[in-house]
Amino acid sequence: MLSRMTDFWGVSFSGDDGKPKQGHEYRTLHDIFGCAEMGIILRWKDGLLHDDGDLPAVEFQDAHIEHYRNGLPHAEKHMPAIIADYGTQCEYYIDGKQVTE
């Protein structure tokens, strides 16, 4: 499994105001020593990871991307939902269910 976000699948997140997260946010992930490791962009709709048009719900600084619809990995059949290792590895999902050929 290539996803780095499995703990987020189907989980609804709220902002500091208690309302479901909306829009996008940039975060910096840190290692156990508190040093910055990598930037990540997260896109939300109604508290769930969700693509914004053609933009993936999750973009890591190292080019790892994950497409989501309503909190679950999703892309149409001809497109991978998860793209890792600079495009050399891909996984296909529809509504959170992995699709194999």
Task: List each model region and its residues.
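Glycine/tyrosine- and acidic-biased, solvent-exposed loop/turn segments at the edges of beta-strands
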Residues: 1-101
